[in-house]
């Protein structure tokens, strides 16, 4: 079956893992406490703080305790949805202020533009929040790439290592799984997508082997028509 849609991961795939861990996470850790204190009364922020209390099992936690919980989650690299949402808000401020620029590999930029021109529908699936995804591509070093994408998915669609998440995404974009090419640098994610019926291609940018999948070192080596 021909590929009609391409679903891509971000970290280690379109973008350097180091950008996330060495730039984005430290920025959020530094600015999150002040952001929460200043904006705790804003509805969008307050709802996320309440979600933190619920997930932590501390319904009566005050703002300072919630901040402490968030910093603990950051230290644990916990994929908590309210943490991701709040990080996204902090990053948005940073991007809008010009303090942050999203990293996207040049080979990924070129390929995504080419595939878009060829008529492939492009989607993102990352553990980072949808807002954070949109910021990386919308405020990238290569300019605004957001117009290339037809949609974004995060952990609200399910964990990235579970096949059902990929079935959910296929249904959401109204495209049979066998017509979707999924790109990632993580074998367990590729396995889950494959189990859901998707076609897979791994990115091994630093060498290595992604067992059970076709894999390449650059987006320049991916031809969707060859799958």
From Swiss-Prot:
Which GO biological process entries does UniProt record here?
Answer: L-methionine salvage from methylthioadenosine
Metabolic or biological pathway:
Amino-acid biosynthesis; L-methionine biosynthesis via salvage pathway; L-methionine from S-methyl-5-thio-alpha-D-ribose 1-phosphate: step 3/6; Amino-acid biosynthesis; L-methionine biosynthesis via salvage pathway; L-methionine from S-methyl-5-thio-alpha-D-ribose 1-phosphate: step 4/6
Q: Which Gene3D superfamilies match?
A: 1.10.720.60, HAD superfamily/HAD-like
Keyword Mitochondrion applies: no
Q: Which InterPro entries match?
A: Enolase-ppase_E1 (IPR023943), HAD-like_sf (IPR036412), HAD-SF_hydro_IA (IPR006439), HAD_sf (IPR023214)
Q: Which keywords does the record carry? A: Amino-acid biosynthesis, Hydrolase, Magnesium, Metal-binding, Methionine biosynthesis
Q: Which PANTHER family match?
A: ENOLASE-PHOSPHATASE E1
Q: Which family does it belong to?
A: Belongs to the HAD-like hydrolase superfamily. MasA/MtnC family.
The protein here is known as: Enolase-phosphatase E1
Please name the source species.
Pseudomonas savastanoi pv. phaseolicola (strain 1448A / Race 6)
């Amino acid at each position: 079956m021909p590929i009609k849609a391409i679903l891509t991961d971000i970290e280690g795939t379109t973008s350097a893992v180091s950008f996330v861990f060495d730039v984005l996470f430290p920025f959020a850790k530094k600015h999150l406490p002040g952001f929460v204190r200043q904006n705790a009364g804003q509805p969008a922020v307050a709802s996320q703080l309440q979600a933190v209390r619920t997930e932590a099992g501390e319904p009566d936690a005050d703002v300072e305790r919630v901040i402490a919980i968030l910093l603990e989650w950051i230290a644990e690299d916990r994929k908590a949805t309210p943490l991701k949402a709040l990080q996204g808000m902090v990053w948005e401020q940073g991007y809008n202020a010009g303090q942050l620029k999203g990293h996207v590999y040049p080979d990924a930029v070129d390929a995504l533009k080419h595939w878009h021109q060829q008529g492939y529908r492009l989607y993102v699936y990352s553990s980072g929040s949808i807002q954070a995804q949109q910021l990386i591509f919308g405020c990238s070093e290569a300019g605004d790439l957001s117009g290339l994408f037809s949609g974004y998915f995060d952990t609200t669609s399910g964990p990235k290592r579970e096949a059902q998440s990929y079935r959910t995404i296929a249904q959401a974009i109204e495209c049979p799984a066998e017509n979707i090419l999924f790109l990632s640098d993580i074998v367990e994610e590729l396995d889950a997508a494959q189990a859901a019926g998707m076609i897979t291609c791994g990115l091994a940018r630093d060498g290595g082997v992604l067992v059970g999948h076709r894999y390449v070192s650059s987006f320049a080596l991916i031809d969707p028509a060859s799958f």
